[in-house]
């Protein structure tokens, strides 16, 4: 299996399966001298880990990360950073009844046809369990970006049919949904409780924002910053769509509304989401991602077995009724990995470039 490494200068390689002994990652390209300890990584892992509320999977994983290499006396050395998270709460017997069946809308069928063999226990390599390593690696990127004045944060902007207007960052970490409107939390909880009673699942929309990004990141033509972000975010399990800035809403906009006019005091809008011509503009970079409802539900669904016979599939085990609830830290991590990669690439080629034009802020 190829495709396990992401990035060009700052790279992340992951390995491991949902019900294997452990997950591992190798992070290459982190600049030396960055102060880094376990808590820097564990903080974001705790935000993503399962079993933290009744609205997520009840699989109990501590997700305690170990740093195996690349850090000495509390600072990165420039060497590869090895990371490990041990799996401790696998219940593989939950999947024995479907080992010869294909769960509809899962990777079972496509993995079977591509590789001729698949780990049916919790989805194996296709499980979102793998994203724990991305969050750990992304925490390293976030730590370095913070030294450059770049802050990356995310929140849930829609759960099923419930639109969630942004009110304040202050409430995002105070609830299980990463909801920026505290008044919406009771409605979200009631919706999820009913969803569980219905033995069903639902999708979600996540918004992730990077502030403090300098102008100039991005490599046209084929490594545009928005294209790389879309690539990274689409690589998150269950993501079916990505928007940058106004996204698909730009179809209904006129040029007079969509263009981000400039004055000596700053930009008058940010419909472009902080990226123009594939290059960061210095405005906040804003991306939205849509996650599908998982098909791992106990309501029977029609499918086939490995011999092509018709079958009804009921997925037992412990699953998230809305995978978007835990997706915010993953989206933050992938944006951080992309931005650090492009920061290092920009530094390598364009570090000596300077212009007299002032950097505009957002009015």
From Swiss-Prot:
SUPFAM superfamilies reported in the protein's UniProt record: Chorismate synthase, AroC (SSF103263)
Catalytic reactions of this protein: 5-O-(1-carboxyvinyl)-3-phosphoshikimate = chorismate + phosphate
GO biological process, alphabetically ordered: amino acid biosynthetic process; aromatic amino acid family biosynthetic process; chorismate biosynthetic process
EC numbers on record: 4.2.3.5
InterPro entries in UniProt: Chorismate_synth (IPR000453), Chorismate_synth_AroC_sf (IPR035904), Chorismate_synthase_CS (IPR020541)
Pfam families membership: Chorismate_synt
Binding site for FMN: 125-127, 237-238, 277, 292-296, 318
Binding-site list for NADP(+): 48, 54
Keywords: Amino-acid biosynthesis, Aromatic amino acid biosynthesis, FAD, Flavoprotein, FMN, Lyase, NADP
Name of this chain's protein: Chorismate synthase
A GO molecular-function descriptor: FMN binding
Organism for this UniProt entry: Pseudomonas savastanoi pv. phaseolicola (strain 1448A / Race 6) (Pseudomonas syringae pv. phaseolicola (strain 1448A / Race 6))
Keyword NADP: yes
Co-factor note (free text): Reduced FMN (FMNH(2)).
Family as reported in the entry's similarity comment: Belongs to the chorismate synthase family.
GO cellular-component term (any): cytosol
UniProt pathway: Metabolic intermediate biosynthesis; chorismate biosynthesis; chorismate from D-erythrose 4-phosphate and phosphoenolpyruvate: step 7/7
Stated role: This reaction introduces a second double bond into the aromatic ring system.
Subunit field text: Homotetramer.
Co-factor(s): FMNH2
EC primary class: lyase
């Amino acid at each position: 299996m190829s495709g396990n490494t992401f990035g060009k200068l700052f790279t992340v390689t992951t390995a491991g399966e949902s019900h294997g002994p452990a997950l591992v990652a190798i992070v290459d390209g982190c600049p030396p001298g960055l102060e880094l300890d376990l808590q820097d990584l564990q903080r974001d892992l705790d935000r993503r880990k399962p079993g933290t509320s009744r609205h997520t999977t009840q699989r109990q994983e501590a997700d305690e990360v170990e740093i195996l290499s690349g850090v000495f006396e509390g600072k990165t050395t420039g060497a590869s950073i090895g990371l490990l998270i041990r799996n401790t709460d696998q219940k593989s017997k939950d999947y024995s009844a479907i080992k010869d069946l294909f769960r509809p809308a899962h990777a079972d069928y496509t993995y079977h046809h591509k590789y001729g063999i698949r780990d049916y226990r919790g989805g194996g390599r296709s499980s979102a369990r793998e994203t724990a390593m991305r969050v750990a690696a992304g925490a390293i990127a976030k730590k370095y970006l913070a030294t450059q004045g770049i802050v990356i944060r995310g929140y849930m902007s829609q759960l099923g049919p419930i639109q969630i207007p942004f009110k304040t960052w202050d409430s995002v970490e105070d609830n299980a949904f990463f909801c920026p409107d505290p008044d919406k939390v009771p409605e979200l909880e009631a919706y999820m409780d009913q969803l569980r009673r219905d033995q069903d699942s639902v999708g979600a929309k996540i918004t992730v924002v990077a502030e403090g990004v300098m102008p100039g990141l991005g490599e046209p033509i084929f490594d545009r910053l928005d294209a790389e972000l879309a690539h990274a975010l689409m690589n998150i399990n269950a993501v079916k769509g990505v928007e940058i800035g106004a996204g698909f809403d730009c179809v209904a906009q006129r040029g007079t509304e969509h263009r981000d006019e400039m004055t000596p005091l700053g930009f008058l809008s940010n419909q472009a989401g902080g990226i123009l011509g594939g290059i960061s503009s210095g405005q906040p970079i804003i991306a939205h991602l849509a996650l599908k409802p998982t098909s791992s539900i106990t309501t029977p669904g029609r499918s086939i077995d490995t011999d092509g016979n018709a079958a009804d599939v009921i997925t037992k085990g412990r699953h998230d009724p809305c995978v978007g609830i835990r997706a915010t830290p993953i989206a933050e991590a992938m944006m951080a990995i992309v931005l650090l990669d492009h920061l290092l690439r920009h530094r390598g080629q364009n570090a000596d470039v300077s212009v007299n034009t002032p950097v505009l802020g957002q009015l």
